[in-house]
């Protein structure tokens, strides 16, 4: 009976594991270079969004994933505001093969972080007295697939740090 329990525990140790440990804001910035004059102008914004993800292996099976959202909003030719958030998470990820680990860190984890980053950015913008910034959902699986395709065409090998 003891051997069966031991063997069962060993089998469980090799099963894939995923657990969110913590979500936090790593960095946050907001600039409104043309305030207060910008508030008196007719509001006709154009929005440019840049997003980026980075991963870093921590001790053991822990990984940090950082999703950076940078937004530049112009009103006409003038920059109304620039806002950036680095939303980070610590994830316990174990017993995945290399392709699954790469996908988890490059698409699954950023997908978890995005709603937090979007809400933080929206709150920051409204606290700057600008209209709410309603960012559309992002398909991180599609972005990940595009990046893998680009790397394959360039002859690069994806790496997990």
From Swiss-Prot:
GO terms for biological process: protein folding; protein tetramerization; protein transport. Transmembrane segments: none annotated. It comes from the Bacteria. SUPFAM superfamilies: SecB-like. It is found in: Cytoplasm. Belongs to the SecB family. One of the proteins required for the normal export of preproteins out of the cell cytoplasm. It is a molecular chaperone that binds to a subset of precursor proteins, maintaining them in a translocation-competent state. It also specifically binds to its receptor SecA. Homotetramer, a dimer of dimers. One homotetramer interacts with 1 SecA dimer. This is Protein-export protein SecB.
